[in-house]
Amino acid sequence: MPSVGLPGAQGDDQVTGTPPVTLVCCGVIGTTVSDNGMVERAYSEAIATQGVVTGTSAYARSMAGVHRSRGQYTLDVMHSLFPENQPRAQAAQLAFDRSYGAAIGRTGVAAVPGAELALDKLRGSGVRVCLISGFSKKVFASVLDALGWWDKIDLAVSPDETPRGAPAPDLVLTAMLRLGVDDVRETAVAMSTEAGVKAGRRAGASVVAGVLTGTVPDGRLRRAGASHVLGSVADLPDLLTATGPAEDLAGR
C-alpha cells in the first residue's frame, strides 16, 4: 500500500526499523473542526438539567472539570462530574447530545481552515484517515453529516464503540485493527487535547502531533507527550513528507 514517509525516512528506516506511515488518526473538535464554543455551551446546558446552574460554585467546579477533560468521552466526563450518581451522569450525557445536536441544526459546524485539504492530501498519497472523537456515535455522525465528510475518511471511531475512551489507547488501537495496520508505528496521530495526545502515545504511534487550533497550549501538549507541535492540522502532510529532521511547525 502507498504510504507517507516519516521525517528523514525513505521506506523502512534501516537504522531504527521505523516503517512509513499508512494510517493517520485525527481528532475532531479543535483539530479538524472548529469549536466556536459549542462544546462548552452544550456542557453548560447539560449540567443545568441536573440542577447545576451558572453563578453557583458547583457550576464553576463542574466547568473547570469539563475544561480539564477535553478530548475525553462525554459520558466519562459526566461520570466525573456526578461520581456518586450514574443515572444523573447518563441523563446529563443525553442532554449534552441533544444540546449539541440542536446547535448543529441551528448553525452547522465548520472545518478548521486547511483541514479538508489536508485530509485530501493524505488520502491522495495512499494514507488511510480515521477521525476520532469524544462524542457519542450519534453526535459524531451528525458532525460528519453536517460537514459532508464521509467520503473524505476511511473510518470514524467513537468511544461508545470501544472499551475505553481517551486517554486510553483504545480508539487509536481500534482504528489500527479495523484498517489492518500491521505495526503500530505505521500510525500518526494528530490531536488538540492532552487526552488525545496521551492516547496516541499509549497506542505506540510513531508520530503524535499536538495541534494548536484547540484550547490547549503548546506546553501542555508537550507535557502530555506530543512528539511534534503543529500550528494546524493543515501542516500534517508536510510533516509526514519532510525529508529533514523532525521539527515543530507551530505558527507556520
Regions found by a protein language model. Give the residues of each.
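Acidic, Mg2+-coordinating phosphoryl-transfer loop and its flanking beta/alpha structural elements
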Residues: 188-228
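N-terminal helical cap/lid subdomain that shapes the substrate entry/recognition surface
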Residues: 5, 17-117, 121
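Conserved H-loop
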Residues: 53, 150-154, 182
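Substrate-recognition element of Asp-dependent hydrolases with the DxDx(T/V) motif
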Residues: 43, 115-145, 200
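Non-catalytic pre-domain segments flanking phosphatase-related domains
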Residues: 1-26, 248-252
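Conserved SAM-binding loop
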Residues: 32, 111, 129, 189-190, ...
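Conserved Lys-Pro-Asp/Glu-containing loop-to-beta segment of HAD-superfamily phosphomonoesterases
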Residues: 166-195
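Short acidic, glycine/proline-enriched helix-loop-strand junctions
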Residues: 164, 170-172, 184-185, 217-252
